[in-house]
Each structure stands twice: as C-alpha cells, then as structure tokens.
Amino acid sequence: MYFPMELKHNPTGKDDIDAEREHREEILGELAESMNESTESPEGDEEKFNSEPSAELEALLPYYSQVEDEALKVAKKYFHGTFIANSQNVNGQKLFEYAHNGHTYRCYVDIYNENEREINIIEVKATTISKYIYKEINKGGKKERKGLYFTDAHGGNPYSLIIKDGNIWRFNTADSKVNDYALEKFEEKKKYLLDKYRKEGKHPYDLAFQRFVIEGALRKAGDKRPVNYYLAVLNSEYVCDGAVDENGKRVYNNVDGQEIITFIELNETTKAYQETILKEIAILESYISTPHDVSKKVDVGEYCAWGEKTECRFWRHCFQTLRGVPDTNRANNYVYCKGSFNEGKIENKYQLVNEGYWTFDDVPMDWLVKENHKIQRDCYDNGAEHVDKEKIQYWFDQLEYPIYHFDFEGFPCPLPRFKGERPYAQSVFEFSLHIEREPGICDKEKDNFIFLNEECYDDERKALAKAIIDHFEFNEDGTLKGTMLAQFTTYEKGRLEELANLYPEYSKKLLAIRDKSADLLHLLRNNKEMYEEMYKKEYENKYGKPYEDIIMEMPNDIKKKMKAEMKKAGEIINYYHKDLGGSYSIKKTLPVLVPSLTYKGMDVGNGVQAYIAYINYDSDEPTFNTLKTKAKRRDALKRYCQQDTWAMVEILKAVRRKIK
C-alpha cells in the first residue's frame, strides 16, 4: 500500500512507489504467517517470526520463489494458452492498472494465463490447502474435526466445503443439497471466505481486490473474455518421493495423483467480495481527499494479533496508550481470558483495551472470578510467587530415572526436502540430549550428546535416528528405561513418530521413547488429564476403591463439590511469577527460575535463527553478522541446542528447591 508524503497520516514514511519493494514486503509477511502456522509450539512461544521484514525472513525468500516456480509448472498441466510469470522480479509479471475517481489502482499477477476463450488469474500463496479442507485428526484418543466443513444435522455427517475436481478445488454444491440443514450450514461456512480477518478469508480478499482492478482495466480495454480467479497453494497431502533430475535437483512429480501445488477456484467468492472492496476504496479515497483525524480512537480486535509475533506493524498507532506499558503489565497477560471478566461481559483481551483497561492492574479486582487470574494478580500486586507444592511433587513422582532432557531442531521448509516429507514438514537436523541419572545429578558437558547434520542438503535423518536410539537406554521388554523430558512434548513426539515411520528398523525403540515422556509445561503450567487423575488417586487411596464407585455413593451436593474440585485441580496453574507475563515459554521461565542462565548474547538464540544458520551452512554471506564460516555456524548451533536441554536440567533443580 502506498502512503504519499503529503498525507497527514503516513505511518510507513514511504515517498515513492516501488513495486519490487512492496512485493518483497508482502512476500515476507506471507512467509512469516505461513512459517508460524507450521510451527508446533504453545501459544506465545518466541520460536516464531515477527511480522516485520528481517534478515531471517530474507534468507527464506529463495524458497518462496521456488513455490512460485513450482506453481507455474503445475499450472501449465491444467490450464491452456500462454503464461506470464516471473518469480524473481515483480516487474516481469503482468501488470493491470485501473483509473477510478481520479486515482490509479495497480496489481501484478503472479501467474497470468490466457487463451482465446478465457483469462485465468492465479495468485500464488506459500500457505497450504489444509485450512480450507475438511480433515479428521486424532487428538488425545478422540477424533476432532478440522478445516472448513458443514454437516447435514447437528453433530451429523461432515462434508468438506470445497471438493477436488482434478487438481482444482471448487465449492461442494452437490452435498449442500442433501437437506435444508446442510444447505444452510454450507452458506454459513462460505461466508468464512468473505471475512478478511479470518485465516480462511485473508487470501480470497487479496484476490478480490485484484478482481476489482483487473475487470475495471479489461472493461476499459473492451476485452469481454470471462475471467477466472484461483489461489495456488501448497498441497498438504503431497508426500515427496525423493526424485531428482540429472543435476541432483529435487523434482516434484505427481505422486499417486497428488501434485505439489493445488488450486482453489474463487470466482463466486471474489465476486461476492466486490461490495466490500468498493466500500473500502471509497473510505480510502475520502482519506486522501479530505483531512482526517488520525488520533481518533480505533477499536482493536483479533486482526491486530496484539502481543503475538505477527502483531500488526501499526499497533503503536492504534494502541497509543500502551506505548509505555512494560510487557509484564499488559492486560493481555491474563491467561485463558476469553469471556472471563465482569461476569462474561468482557469477551476477550481486545474488548478490555477498547473499554480502557490497558494494564494488568486496570482490571477491577471484583472482575477476577477465575482462580488463575486471582493468582496472577496477587503475584503482580504483592510480588508474591505462586507454588502449588502438591501438584508439582505429583509431577516429579511420575518420573522414572534416568531423565533424558531432549530437544530437536527442525526446518519447516515450504517445499519438502527429502523423501517422505510434506510441505512445511519439520525436517529435523539436530538434537541435544542431557541425561540426568539421579535427581540433580547431571554434568553440562559430560552428560550431553549432540547430533548435528554435517551438510544442509544431504539427507542425514537415518544417522540422526540411529544416534537417538544409541543414546537412550531400554529395558529387556523394549520399553524405555527412564523418562524423556521436553518443553512441549507434542513436537518431539511428532518427530519421533515420523522417524519411526521412515525407518522401520528403528521404529520400536523410537516409539518406546515417545510413549514414556514428560512435559515441562505440565510441571509449571498445568495439565487437565494429569492433575484430575491425581485428584482421583487421592480419593482412591483414601477409600480403597475406584473413584467412579466412590462418587456414585456420595450425596448429590458432595458429588457436585467433588467434581468442581477435580476440575479446579486440572485448571489451576502450578507456578506463577509476575515476570512470566502470562507465558510459560522457556525463554520466559528461565530468567525467572535460573537468572544466571541466559540466551542473550548467543550467536544463535532461538529456533528460527537455528534453522536459518543451518540452511546457510555454505553461504559466503555472514549469518547474523558474526557467523562468517560453516564451522562457526555449526558451533553456534551446538551451543544453542545444548542450552535448550541444559536449561531444562537447571529448571528442574530450581523447582525442586522451591518445594522442599
């Protein structure tokens, strides 16, 4: 977007139109969003990209260009005629200009295709088809429905909103006619694509603006050919077969009917968006022609992504009152705050801000009805430290020694790098392991093992998998001797499963590690299933019978009280300190619990920097201005990954001291 200097409100300070720069910044933003979507980490973790352009994102631009190149290759299989595309320079793309009310609107088309009968506009995005289609996943032993779908009754049969026709996804009009209920829900879900603030509606909105410009330009040119609009996205169902060309370069063949790129037809959606586009253009033009009050209060919402890594770059304008508020005192630091304040009248953290409750202590005490919020507020107001010794001790009691403090580093490459990988698969290249054989007995160097790929472009996953099982100990029955510990075990367990599927000879032991794990988040934050089970065991030990039998024998009022207490045990946080700021990422907990240990000043200081250093192994350009050689990059990666597992060792020591 272009903001001329003469305008009163020019937040970006731009004074010229630079299409290449604009396009580059747009791509960087898309990359940040797509990479963050692919990152399996708890909400608020720092292992994500900022929305601002950065050296880390710049290093990933070649991968985005590859996505555009692959999209063109696949498009040529399914569309006929001539093509105009250029992944390296936006000025080589098809340009449309449309003059409207004295203003000129421009758009470049990623892939322009035309023939005598029609024009096809293809907008390439580095995201995947996953968010748009129905899928069923297994979560904690329960099936969970994801994506865009509708049903034929309340809780009835699910149908995907869009279905595949060849390699093009279109609205599922056939199943919408099953009955009136299905048709109603089908129309409701279609509207998700018309909400630019939803993850499903953002990209259709971009394409709809292009439609406004393109069709305006074509009308003036007298071109009456029909125009079709498509998103080209990565196919999350595609599994790389490992094929390469004669030069050893990866080739993405059609594998079992799946292409690496798939298309979503959005003619109906982009047409329905035009009313919104015209209204917003009228507002934009009024801002240009008429001075307006830029200090006027603007309501904030989910679209601001406030406090997240991808927060809007203009938040300092809309959140002017928050400029001087320290992170630890932001109102959004209350955990699980949806519908939690003022008897549910305050829906979320954005409504808090819109109504003038900007800081932690702005929120009235009588609004705090949830126990967690009362704990947080007490810690903030009084400098207290919350430690639930009983629950923390229960967590320690579940551990079997030795403890394997374990951490993977992976690269979520947009295009799969090796056989068996999908788009944005976490391609693991390093792990660190600290072995704690008895409580508190672990040496940072002697009890540590690190595996790090020798090369970036070689598939070393088999050697990595073997190194894992060689450094864990197993019982005669094949089970793990001890407990694998990680921060957010979902990530480590997922990678172990993937390696087990790739290498059957190592499968049994890799899955044995997965099946005996503990999570540092469950120690410090909470875990519903674990601590509800703790509550049940206390009653079973007291009465000598199963919990279900005990509760059946209780009067209704006692039964109700017991259920409430069990729910409370599963929800209340185990540990809190005001400096956590509502986050339990290791970058927050470490300074609080082990202030002598820090990531500050490290050449590689987070997971993003880790894989950027890895993919730049052989680059002649300095990485982060200090890592000028491959040897230095490898050394920095080893020290960073070692720090992750050593931090877990030290955190356990610190927590043990607090419950003595």
Residue ranges of predicted features:
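Two-metal-ion RNase H-like nuclease active-site motif
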Residues: N89-E97, P402-P412, D519
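A short acidic (Asp/Glu
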Residues: I133, C240-V244, P414-K419, E492-L502
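Conserved RNase H-like, two-metal-ion catalytic cores of nucleic-acid enzymes
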Residues: E68, L72-F79, I121-E123, T128, ...
